[in-house]
């Protein structure tokens, strides 16, 4: 536990983290990935290059410092971190590496006049406290997944049994376990971790499960990303019959039980977790409003499948919005999703459960629009790993 003096020091560094947190975490990642190559597979290099990962860490460190006296207020953020760590198999031995590099980064970026021994000591204690919380919670989750029916710990060998082209950009991959035994049933909205060897280098990635799990196989649907090492490998190299290692499903962006009308809003490849949510909701005969936004029909994945569901389930209402239509299948609206469109497509009664996912700008707009239409904020759920202010 931190003492009162250490907590006061942590809180005093908040202004420094607000102004220079990203510079600190950028330096931290550069140092750690250079000196400890064994942890490189745990981090997406594209997210490093774009700055997304340093920004997300800077936000996490800042939130921790701000709430050092009220850690219970970080429950949502901590839950996200724990699930991400479990999906990538972050282990206790990784924490000392992160801790030592973080303390060095604080000292080197802030300078010894600011990063005094007392400051370093306080942040060392704070990091140790956080590490203990995460390690304990992650072990509980590892154990839970290992002991569940169809579950396992660490990696498990799976074979690609089918792949399907869903749009000009998205391919679905179906994986079944090589041992032929059942697999852990994921909750709708969760993701799975992949461990691959590409050009002699280990790569790990998380992908949302895009179908309700039947206990026999998993499906992910991957968009080809320009310069994306793993997405391009999956699209171009992974063939039916090939094997790879999977980690158990994880994630806390999941469909909660409710009898309220369900609103699922997605942009682009953000559609993937909503598909499993849609399947689960239709099994309960729940009213569902499914709204998807895409550039055009060529990149719109799963349209025929969703249209088929709508034809068989009168409680499902689906709406499509295309930003730049290029002929082919028509959309219900053209342009960007607006509050006026949402007002038309949502139930008249705004007491709904809304789940949305997509690019950052899209999510910021949807969050604002739902609030403007009177959807209770506590009933609007999304998954975003950056600063919450980025969606305001």
Curated annotation (Swiss-Prot):
GO MF: FAD binding; heme binding; metal ion binding; nitric oxide dioxygenase NAD(P)H activity; oxygen binding; oxygen carrier activity
Catalytic activity as recorded in UniProt: 2 nitric oxide + NADPH + 2 O2 = 2 nitrate + NADP(+) + H(+); 2 nitric oxide + NADH + 2 O2 = 2 nitrate + NAD(+) + H(+)
Entry binding sites for NADP(+): 268-273
GO biological-process terms attached to the record: cellular response to nitrosative stress; nitric oxide catabolic process; response to toxic substance
Site residues, Influences the redox potential of the prosthetic heme and FAD groups: 84, 383
CDD domains attached to this UniProt entry: flavohem_like_fad_nad_binding (cd06184), HmpPa-globin-like (cd14780)
Function: Is involved in NO detoxification in an aerobic process, termed nitric oxide dioxygenase (NOD) reaction that utilizes O(2) and NAD(P)H to convert NO to nitrate, which protects the bacterium from various noxious nitrogen compounds. Therefore, plays a central role in the inducible response to nitrosative stress.
Record protein name field: Flavohemoprotein
Annotated source species: Pseudomonas putida (strain ATCC 47054 / DSM 6125 / CFBP 8728 / NCIMB 11950 / KT2440)
